[in-house]
Amino acid sequence: MKRIFFVALISVLLAACGGKDTYKIKGTVEGLEDGTVVTLNLMGYNSLAEIDSAIVKNGKFTFKGETDTAEVAVITFDLGDNIGGCEMYLERGDIDVLINVDKGFQRIGGTPNNNAFQGFVNEIESLNDEVQELEDKIRITLASQGDCTDYYKQMGELQDRYKKILSQNIYDNAGMLHGYRQLMENYTLFEPEEVMGFLEELAPAFGGDLAFAQLTAITNAQLSVSLGHPYVDFEAPILNKKGGYYETTAKLSDYVSKNKIVLLDFWASWCTPCINEIPFIKAAYKKYKSKGFEVVSVSVDEETDEWINAVKDNGMNWVQLWNGDDDMDNSAAVKYSISAIPSTFLIDADGTIIGLNLRETELEEALEDYFKNK
C-alpha cells in the first residue's frame, strides 16, 4: 500500500532515568578506505542533524557521547556517486555496528532497541527475497500479457506473513522506541481494530506523544467507517462520459440509493497496486453490473489531467470522481480517513459497509455470495 498522508513521525524522546547516560558505538566497516569520514546523524522529520564524525582506521570507527533519550540515528559516509547509510538507534550502552558496503548490508546490536531492530531484519530477510523473486515473475508475465492471478495470490500470502511478523514485533517491543516506530511507519498495513489494539499496548510508554494522539484520532475516524457501520456521504467533482471535467459534482448517495451494492474505490494514477487491481474490478463490474452492482472510484491525484488520462488508458467505464486538493477538509478521502491506497468499501443497498479492502478475486467472490443470498 502506498501512503498518501503522513503522521509527523515520532516526536517523542524517551527520557532515561537519572540524567544523561553514555553511549559508545563500535563500528566495523568493509569496503571503505581508511581515512573515510563517517558521520553520526540524528534523524528528524525529512532531515538529518549531524552530531559527530569519525575517521575509518584499519576498517574501524568509534563514536562516544552522552544521551538522555533513545532516538533514531543514521551513520552516513560518502561513496563518491552517492551517500551510504546505516540506520540504528542511539541510546545508552555499547552499540556494535557492522557495515559491508559492497554487499549492501548492515548488522547492529548491543542495546535493547538495536537488538530488537536487528531481530526484525533477520526475520524478514528471506521473506524479502521471496517478494523480490515474485515481483520479477509478475513483471515478466505482465510484459507478455500473461495471467498473474496465481502470482497475486502468492503475493497476498507473503504480505500476510510479513504482517504477522511485524505485528508480533510491535507487541514484543511495545515499551521501546523500536516498537512505537514500527507502528508509526506501518500502521496503514493493518485494520483500524488492529491499530487500536497496538495503541492500547503502547499507551503506557507513548500515550503523551503528539504522533500517538494523531494516530488515535485517525484510527477512531477509520472505525466510524468500518464493517457494519453506515456509509458516509460526500460530494465530489465527476468525470462525464465523454472524458471531460467541468466542475460538475455528484454525491455517493446518488449511487447507493439507485443500486443494490456499490464499491467505493480510492485510487490514483501513480499507484501501481491500484492499477494492478483494475482488471479485477473490471471483471466484477462486467459480470454483476446488470444485477445492480456499481463502482464509484475516487481519484486522489493532484492533477486532473493525470486522473483523466489514467481512466481512459485503463478503460475504467464506471463512475469516476475526483477527491480534489489535499487541503480540502471536507473531501471524500478525509471523511473516510484514507491514509493508504488502494482502499475500498463495499456498501449494500441499506447503506451498510459490508466489505473492506477486497483484493483481486475477493471482490468477485463477495459479490457472488451477496447476490446468491438475494
List the predicted regions and their residue ranges.
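Bacterial Sec-dependent N-terminal signal peptides
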Residues: 1-28, 374
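A non-transmembrane, solvent-exposed segment enriched in polar/low-complexity residues
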Residues: 17-164
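Short, acidic, Ser/Thr-enriched surface-loop or helix-capping motifs
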Residues: 56, 238-239, 347-348
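N-terminal targeting signals for export/organelle localization
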Residues: 83, 95, 106, 156-230, ...
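A short beta-strand-turn-helix
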Residues: 235-262
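Conserved redox-active cysteine motifs that mediate thiol-disulfide chemistry
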Residues: 266-283
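Conserved segment of the thioredoxin-like fold in thiol-based oxidoreductases
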Residues: 286-328, 334-341
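Thiol/disulfide oxidoreductase modules built on the thioredoxin-like
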Residues: 316, 325-372
